[in-house]
Design a protein with these regions (language model features):
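Catalytic cores of Mg2+-dependent Asp-rich isoprenoid enzymes
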Residues: 1-140, 146-241
């Protein structure tokens, strides 16, 4: 189904294939969803495809490219652990974190330049911003992996094959790259949008480093509000490009 949805977004599905997919998504799959928002999204997938057809060609190309990468990563995730319980190399981890998150930072950067031009960020920094966007996305996904690694291991899925501390340090570097990325964007709203997940990720990492048992860590709501204020403060001034 995942690959069928990817083909539909790419515009490669026949009318019969689309009809079959819509029936599956709006029927059994939607009924099986406990989250109402996810149920609605599946039921309205056809509307998403219709909206895609109304968008500028350049934006459609960006969307199709990032969806293809994400589908590839999620498909890998669904099949890789059928006959193994741990990734075989750090390269596997880096590839996976790019496919499910790093590519989104790259996409968001490209979309920003496509729709806003120099108002998004200095054109001279485009390549650097794309690279930083990839690292930022990877950092956020690494936080998910580090936070959930005990639960994942219990299900026979380990996304890391080397020292956890090294990956914690790498995640921190990537998230700080995200803060730098956000500080260079051209408007308060853009900077604020990036600062919040970066700060939440760093706070979650601090909890991961300090946990003494198997408990799943979560940033307290009061701390989230404080981080929002901090993000607003950091977003007031734009860093020189």
């Amino acid at each position: 189904v995942l690959q069928q949805m990817g083909r539909a977004v790419e515009g490669k599905s026949t009318s019969d294939e689309l009809a079959e997919l819509h029936g599956l998504l709006s029927g059994k799959m939607a009924e099986a969803q406990q989250n109402p928002a996810e149920r609605t999204l599946l039921q309205r997938f056809g509307e998403c495809l219709d909206m895609l057809q109304t968008m500028p060609e350049a934006q459609v190309g960006l969307i199709r490219r990032v969806v293809a990468v994400i589908v590839e990563g999620q498909s890998w995730d669904l099949t890789y652990f059928d006959n193994r319980s741990q990734v075989e190399s750090d390269e596997d981890t880096l590839r996976y974190t790019y496919q499910v998150a790093g590519c989104v930072g790259e996409f968001w950067t490209d979309l920003g330049y496509e729709t806003m031009g120099a108002r998004f960020c200095s054109p001279a920094r485009r390549d650097l911003m794309r690279q930083a966007g990839v690292r930022f996305g990877r950092g956020l996904q690494l936080i998910n992996i580090l936070r959930d690694m005990r639960e994942d291991a219990a299900r026979g899925r380990s996304y890391l094959c080397s020292d956890e501390v090294c990956w914690q340090n790498r995640a921190e570097r990537f998230l700080r790259d995200g803060l730098d990325y956000g500080s260079r964007l051209g408007s308060f709203r853009l900077r604020f949008t990036v600062m919040i997940p970066a700060l939440l990720g760093l706070s979650t990492l601090q909890l991961i480093r300090g946990r003494k048992n198997q408990a799943r860590v979560k940033v307290p709501r009061r701390k989230v509000y404080w981080l929002m204020l901090k993000a607003a403060f950091l977003s007031v001034m734009r860093r020189a490009s």
